Amino acid sequence: MTNIRKTHPLMKIINDAFIDLPTPSNISSWWNFGSLLGLCLIVQILTGLFLAMHYTPDTMTAFSSVTHICRDVNYGWVIRYLHANGASMFFICLYAHMGRGLYYGSHAFRETWNIGVILLFTVMATAFVGYVLPWGQMSFWGATVITNLLSAIPYIGTTLVEWIWGGFSVDKATLTRFFAFHFILPFIIMALAIVHLIFLHETGSNNPTGIPSDMDKIPFHPYYTIKDILGALLLILTLLMLTLFAPDLLGDPDNYTPANPLSTPAHIKPEWYFLFAYAILRSIPNKLGGVLALLLSILVLALIPMLHTSKQRSMMFRPFSQFLFWVLVADLLTLTWIGGQPVEHPYVIVGQLASILYFLLILVLMPVTSLIENKLMKW
């Protein structure tokens, strides 16, 4: 008799995706982040569901309802901080996952990569609307500043902003619709993640060498299930340490002040995971130019498959490209730091140089270096 997991229509799908999936035997721990992102998404949906049971999306009561969750709901403070810090863990895993994809040439899987870029946009949108919900000072002013950027669009800009706001300023209508978006988007992310996996399993996973490994595949279970469990335990440990020992480490103290349209915070800045994009936005003195640069800083990822000029897929055997990759990582860390600093000398010029370097690396230096490496390899 054939095993039920190989015959039952539903079990067969799970079996082909997580049990009997042929996997390269040499993938490193950098390949753990996909499953960790799945875990983060589950944690966020569960904690978010319990928060939604007690939260009220109304300007008069939103801030109080979050306080009520922390003070009066059984373990409400744990759920709230797991959700807030879970978002940070989500982005850490996301950026590591993308960095691994860039380094090892995973963008050769065009469909998988493009769905990944769409996923990144969706996750960023979810995090943005979610940050508005506690209705603190930074929530309110962050929403005002970022939505206002759309007014830079010629002709329809102002109308578009007022349409998103549901009025002439960020108010009750804005908060209500942002809550609705924040509730629906994670399920859209889940659907996209499944599509991401479907496309990945069409080709099979890449591996550190970038060389096809069809002749050397091993079953996903038990080898990689156990490896993923180790990663999951480390992720949960880090999240719990953050939540229980330093819950406000990555947050902004301004968000403990209720939203006040009459008082602007000294420094309006997003959560740490958006600071690199915020720094690029601020580095251009023109509003429309800044908005375009902000969009392009993420959209440029969709161009990476077309900018891949090397004859080798992975950077494993390409030392010059490796160097530029780590320069890019350092540049993004610099931009993240600059995004959190006030707009004054020398931060402005450093931010502008880091922004130029970011686009220069991806669009010019890395493709040209790959061509030079091709020549050095006497191909």
Swiss-Prot record:
Keywords: Electron transport, Heme, Iron, Membrane, Metal-binding, Mitochondrion, Mitochondrion inner membrane, Respiratory chain, Transmembrane, Transmembrane helix, Transport, Ubiquinone. The cytochrome bc1 complex contains 11 subunits: 3 respiratory subunits (MT-CYB, CYC1 and UQCRFS1), 2 core proteins (UQCRC1 and UQCRC2) and 6 low-molecular weight proteins (UQCRH/QCR6, UQCRB/QCR7, UQCRQ/QCR8, UQCR10/QCR9, UQCR11/QCR10 and a cleavage product of UQCRFS1). This cytochrome bc1 complex then forms a dimer. Pfam families: Cytochrom_B_C, Cytochrome_B. Heme b b562 binds at H83, H182. One of its GO terms (biological process) is mitochondrial electron transport, ubiquinol to cytochrome c. Its cofactor is heme b. It comes from Balaenoptera musculus. InterPro entries: Cyt_b/b6_C, Cyt_b/b6_C_sf, Cyt_b/b6_N, Cytb/b6-like_sf, Cytochrome_b, Cytochrome_b_C_euk/bac, Cytochrome_b_N_euk/bac, Di-haem_cyt_TM. A ubiquinone binds at H201. One of its GO terms (cellular component) is mitochondrial inner membrane. It comes from the Eukaryota. The gene is MT-CYB. Binds 2 heme b groups non-covalently. It is found in: Mitochondrion inner membrane. One of its GO terms (molecular function) is ubiquinol-cytochrome-c reductase activity. PROSITE patterns: CYTB_CTER (PS51003), CYTB_NTER (PS51002). Heme b b566 binds at H97, H196. The keyword Membrane applies. This is Cytochrome b.
